[in-house]
């Protein structure tokens, strides 16, 4: 049995509109230590990340602590948007209501989901018994959750929109999905099962 710990990046500086280069804020850098404290004793063998700076920097302290190099995987990057969006909530709701909707030169959620889930399952095939960490993003990670639990939609996404950093643990056995759990490091590492019958995150 292997556990995949997805780590949604810590708070980033939204004054920087470049998706690739946007850094963590000072608070984000401090909060990354909470990720390290939680994961450093989880027998982690591999650390992967989206190539975006904010995702890499969120797991960098953990990688240094465990002396594990971070492998960047392009497929784990955040949804591509053609330009900066001021009314993110309206745009996000429209995308969650229609997985095929996108702006010109942007990605729809179906595309984001396919590339993220494909990359995830390739890692599961490569390391079936290993515990791995993956530096990720809010929307990208949420589409992965939706793949395994279709009840996770816009309402659930809205609940975690401001939760940065955030850990989602996905357990596999013999390449088969077993369960998902949400870990809130700001609430004494509170663990909430993400059930297949419903999204518990909606009802909290």
Q: Where are these predicted regions, by residue range?
A:
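Conserved histidine-centered catalytic loops in small-molecule metabolism enzymes
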Residues: 44-75, 146-149, 171-204
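Short beta-strand scaffold positions
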Residues: 49-50, 114, 135-136
């Amino acid at each position: 049995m292997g556990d995949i710990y997805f780590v949604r990046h810590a708070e980033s500086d939204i004054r920087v509109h470049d998706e690739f280069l946007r850094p963590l804020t000072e608070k984000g850098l401090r909060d990354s230590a909470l990720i390290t404290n939680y994961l450093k004793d989880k027998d982690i063998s591999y650390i992967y990340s989206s190539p975006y700076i904010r995702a890499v920097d969120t797991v960098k302290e953990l990688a240094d602590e465990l002396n594990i190099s971070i492998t960047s995987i392009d497929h784990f990057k955040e949804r591509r948007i053609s330009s900066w969006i001021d009314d993110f909530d309206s745009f996000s709701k429209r995308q969650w209501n229609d997985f095929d909707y996108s702006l010109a030169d942007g990605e729809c959620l179906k595309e984001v989901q396919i590339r993220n889930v494909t990359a995830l399952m390739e890692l599961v095939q490569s390391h079936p018994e290993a515990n791995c960490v993956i530096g990720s993003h809010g929307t990208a990670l949420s589409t992965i959750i939706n793949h395994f639990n279709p009840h996770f939609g816009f309402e659930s996404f809205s609940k975690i929109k401001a939760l940065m950093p955030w850990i989602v643990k996905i357990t596999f056995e013999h390449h088969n999905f077993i369960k998902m759990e949400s870990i809130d490091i700001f609430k004494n590492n509170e663990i909430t099962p993400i059930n297949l019958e419903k999204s518990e995150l909606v009802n909290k």
